[in-house]
């Protein structure tokens, strides 16, 4: 459960109404069942997540992080809460880092060229599983997936088993700053295979 005060701490300004003071989840996908969720619209070269706010609301989102220079659609109810930021991805990462610090679990970071997901699942089982052990869902192990993993931790979490992947130089450094692992497991490191 993410409290609104934590989201406010990463925002430049807010559009708040009387309403919920916490979010059951954080999502970047407007198609997900998002009952009482905080929606974070991300943008890429070929898409703009801000265009899917109405869909996120239909899926149950009750608030959104919103980029300052994006116009708010007129169809959005005035009661819908918005947290204005310069960069939604950076805000997502910062929010995850702050939430990780607040929950303060013992974090086990797992990386390597292969075997990360299997190792993560084994460590999760060895530590006793839910509800006190949290793990990366599937292989959400990048600059978006790791923040979502951290933000989905229950407050009573004692251990977090976080998978960290890399597809460019410096990515593990960023993910380590977010997750702040207490223990690191490196499965193996292989040279990337290049095709011609």
At which residue positions do the language-model features occur?
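N-terminal leader/targeting and accessory segments in enzymes
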Residues: 1-94
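Phosphate-binding loop of NTP-binding sites
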Residues: 8, 89-196
């Amino acid at each position: 459960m993410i409290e609104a005060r934590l989201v406010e701490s990463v925002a430049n300004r807010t559009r708040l109404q009387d309403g919920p003071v916490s979010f059951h989840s954080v999502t970047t996908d407007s198609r997900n069942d998002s009952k009482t969720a905080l929606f974070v619209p991300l943008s890429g070269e070929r898409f703009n997540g801000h265009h899917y706010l109405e869909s996120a609301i239909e899926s149950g989102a009750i608030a959104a992080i919103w980029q300052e220079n994006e116009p708010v659609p007129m169809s959005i109810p005035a009661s819908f809460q918005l947290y204005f930021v310069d960069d939604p991805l950076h805000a997502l990462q910062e929010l995850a880092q702050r939430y990780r610090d607040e929950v303060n679990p013992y974090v086990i970071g797992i990386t390597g060229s292969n075997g990360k997901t299997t190792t993560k699942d084994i460590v999760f089982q060895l530590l006793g599983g839910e509800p006190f052990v949290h793990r990366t869902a599937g292989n959400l192990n990048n600059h978006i997936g790791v923040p979502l993993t951290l933000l989905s931790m229950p407050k009573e979490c004692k251990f977090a088993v976080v998978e960290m992947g890399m597809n460019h130089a410096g990515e593990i450094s960023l993910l380590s700053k977010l997750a702040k692992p207490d223990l690191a497991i490196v499965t193996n490191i292989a040279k990337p295979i290049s095709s011609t």
